[in-house]
Structures are given as structure tokens and as C-alpha cells.
Amino acid sequence: MVNLDELRKKYEEVTQRNSGGNKDFLSKFLITKEGTSIVRLLPAKNEDENFYAETAIHRLENDGQFKNYHCPRVKGDKCPLCDLYYGLWKTDSEDNHNLARSIKARKRYYLNAVERETGDVKILSIGMKLFGKILDCFFDDDYGDITDLEKGFDFKIVKDINGAFPNYDKSAPKPRPSEAGSGAEIAAWMDSLHDIKNLVKIAEYDELKQMAMAYELTAQGMGSAGAVQGTSKPSGGQEKSDDDYLSHLKNLES
């Protein structure tokens, strides 16, 4: 006979451990708040490396649960979901076009940044629009390399939430250059850099293929050849903001 008291203790132990692990993982990220957040973007430890890591994420819903899939095309490999995405756009069906939008791989960029409010090195996870504003600084003679530790610039992330999605159009560097911090602070920050490249864990081709075949079954006029065994019917949903931070981060370990 099952000892329910012992089973309940084990259940609490497992759920608390899982919850704690996810909380620890999320604590590494800088979650931008509505209004202004001041950060100092940090360079890579090695000069020949980029200060950011780039990925593209298919965020898919299956049985009411969302999961992130890092697209193989980031590494130059083939992606069944991207093949389906382009195929759906070649049809005349608006439903197919909506499905294409829901499975689209959306660019994501990870950067190491000092959160000025706390002084901690965090992972800044941003979409293409905000990343583009950061890159603009490098090609602007008034700013240049804003990650320079001696004469770079702090960056103001201004997050407005008036419409359906967050707006970052007012984000910009501070007007004057400055040292990132004291020598001791800089040394500590550079020793605390997160392994942002390790966040990009490319999804397995076979898993993506099964997902693509399952989505194809819901499309109109795609000529799909039967159900995929063991694959639940996915739901397309609506197009999502590439700045949906919390939902993105909670699934990032998957």
C-alpha cells in the first residue's frame, strides 16, 4: 500500500527543487521594467569575440504549453519549420499566413550588462529592434564603441507599454562617455560574465521535423500525407512580440 505521507513529502521536495532551479536561472536575466532602466553593456572577455550571442527562436504552442526551439539556421543548417514557414506564405490562404506568423523564428540577442540599479552583471535578452538601436551607436561618430570600459557610454532602455507590445523607440545612450566603473569593479564584472553563447542550444532536426509535419496537418492545401505518430495537434495562436521577456525566459532552459 502506498504511503501517502511519504509520497507527499517527496512531491513537495521535487516541486520545490524544480521551482528553485527555474528561479535561480531567471535571476541571471535583466528583466526590463516599464520606464527607464540604465545599463552598461560589457565587451567580451576576448577582443576577437562579439559582445553578443545571436539566435532565432521558434516559440511553439503544443497542448496549451509553449516551448522554445533555437533555429538550426543560426548555425547555417536546414530547419524544417522554416521550410514550412516559407511554404505557407506561397499559398493564398490567410489561415496559412497566420500559421506562418505563429511559427516564425524570431531573432534574439543576449548581452552581458551591468544593471546600474544593483551593480550586478546580468544577461540582457532583447529583440531585433532594440539590438538595432544598440548597433546604431557603433556607427555613429558621436558614440562609437559604447562597450568600451574606459570611454564608452551607459545605455538607457526606455520601455513604453501603451500599445499591444512594448516600445523601445526612446532608448538611447547617455549623452556623455564615462568609465564603466572603478578598476576593482571592472575586474569583478569581467570575471562575472555569463556564458551567453551557451544559451543558444540548437534544436534537434528530427524533433523539428515532427513539429513541422504536425503543423502541416493543420494547413490548407499543403498536401500533407497523414498524421505523425505520437505528435499532438499544435495550435497556431497569434503573432507574438519578440520582446515577450518573461514567457520567453521561463522556457529558455527547455
Listing of model-derived features with the role each one plays in the protein:
Residues 1-142:
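OB-fold ssDNA-binding interfaces and closely related basic DNA-contact patches used
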Residues 2-18, 235-254:
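Extended acidic low-complexity intrinsically disordered regions
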Residues 3, 21-24, 32, 44-45, ...:
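Serine/threonine-rich low-complexity intrinsically disordered regions
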Residues 16, 30, 56-57, 173, ...:
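Short linear sequence elements within intrinsically disordered, low-complexity coil regions
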Residues 22-23, 37, 66, 223-228, ...:
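Compositionally biased, intrinsically disordered low-complexity regions
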Residues 79, 145, 239-241:
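Intrinsic disorder/low-complexity signature
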Residues 116-234:
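Compact mixed alphabeta submodule
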